Amino acid sequence: MAMWNRPCQRLPQQPLVAEPTAEGEPHLPTGRELTEANRFAYAALCGISLSQLFPEPEHSSFCTEFMAGLVQWLELSEAVLPTMTAFASGLGGEGADVFVQILLKDPILKDDPTVITQDLLSFSLKDGHYDARARVLVCHMTSLLQVPLEELDVLEEMFLESLKEIKEEESEMAEASRKKKENRRKWKRYLLIGLATVGGGTVIGVTGGLAAPLVAAGAATIIGSAGAAALGSAAGIAIMTSLFGAAGAGLTGYKMKKRVGAIEEFTFLPLTEGRQLHITIAVTGWLASGKYRTFSAPWAALAHSREQYCLAWEAKYLMELGNALETILSGLANMVAQEALKYTVLSGIVAALTWPASLLSVANVIDNPWGVCLHRSAEVGKHLAHILLSRQQGRRPVTLIGFSLGARVIYFCLQEMAQEKDCQGIIEDVILLGAPVEGEAKHWEPFRKVVSGRIINGYCRGDWLLSFVYRTSSVQLRVAGLQPVLLQDRRVENVDLTSVVSGHLDYAKQMDAILKAVGIRTKPGWDEKGLLLAPGCLPSEEPRQAAAAASSGETPHQVGQTQGPISGDTSKLAMSTDPSQAQVPVGLDQSEGASLPAAASPERPPICSHGMDPNPLGCPDCACKTQGPSTGLD
């Protein structure tokens, strides 16, 4: 595979391929340029980090094989392999800080601390596979060596560019042997695709690894016509095919040919134009008329990676659910019912018998479509699991993010993957927002072997709508979207979004602020309400700095930075709101005598622009047109 040299000045100026030395020999990888003692420290730090990141038995073979390959990659003596294996098994973890200090004192790393990141990335990608656990390790090592994680994004992009320039020559014998093997694999691939068509598409892409060559059309889709012409070598074809999926089509090439079980619609829609070594899939929770009638609308500000998709699923039923929500918005016009509802929520009384009669009278409006979507979201999640397990997306890390029923899709996707072999190394991070799923730790325990990076549970303690749909079982059931998941694991991060999300519908309306709150990068120029700002509307003091801050997000992605769940009192996050807007109640734990917010006052009801009734639940189409302060119950 291609190798690039350590940069002299800035990262974008470094060469993409190895430069020959004066004698015509290729330049050695930067990791091998370190002294033997520092190469030992480099490998030892990787071993210790692996043991801390992946202590589960399911990951032991990966850690052992990774360290064996790294020892060989760094040309260390085989005598050190037992020591490195011991480090990867959890022995000697107290020496991590010592190894970090040794590496930071190395003259090469003093000039350019990205050397280790660059070398470890090259090693992780040398076989055309980018395991999610390897990327988590690279991120962790990058943070330990005090290198901004944005530098890793630059290096990954440069590696992708370097693949365009691979021009490895093949001998006639090697070429003939390769073509013979490819013909066999081609027929096998055609057979599998035929079976997939009969089976409804569940095994499409099963040969997304090295089994199929990258066709010219697929290569042009990824890197353009000029770049495709440069990928004529076996190494370039193998790496690109393995990383980006069968025939280069990736997720955009997947289309469910036939109905699978209860699923009627399942397809991936691109959110971005580029390609990246790691991808993000966003899952929307419902559709509504107006601004949120498309699957991509809530994710306009998402910038977690250069290659992002949204899952389009069961639009008919999600639209019915959205219409049901709007019906409830129009039906709860009575101010007495509104005040009673607010008082009920503020008092923390959410048992079925305490819900206002006016709300219970229209319960069937929401219960029926909600129940249908609950069932279908579980089926869609299981189908998504098989798509990811078949490597339709290629062999690269995947981040999943979803809100409401979209988070439920991801939850059942992880459940299904956990039951299959070889489920490790595919999923990097998952972000579940307002998830209508079980919150008991025992149900989340299997996710530890599936997710390599972070498991973020974003919840709102004052989400009355989620409480209402679970009103008959909320006493026995812990709902993840209402409270933290008490699983003691370095992956799990519970983020209390009560100060950002005033109700369930805000998960779509406040997505930009939510993404920043959970540490996901967003595009610059988006305000807290998810509205695109004009160039002159950024803060006048330091507009460029503000844009940069918005682009990188408020919280950098550091693997394992949160140990266990965050308590509800310490994880409240500030939300920038309109100065005229009344303070939103922070949750259900307030005292019995808590006063009602200003929005509940009969003198100043928020009037819905539908022209019919007040808007107590925050209609997404007219929330920006309400008169007077409106904390709402959306």
From Swiss-Prot:
Residues 542-612 are annotated as: Disordered. One of its GO terms (cellular component) is membrane. The chain crosses the membrane at residues 203-223, 231-251, 346-366. Residues 150-190 form a coiled coil. It is a multi-pass membrane protein. Residues 552-583 have a biased composition (Polar residues). Keywords: Coiled coil, Membrane, Transmembrane, Transmembrane helix. It is found in: Membrane. It holds the Pfam family DUF726. It comes from the Eukaryota. Belongs to the TMCO4 family. This is Transmembrane and coiled-coil domain-containing protein 4.
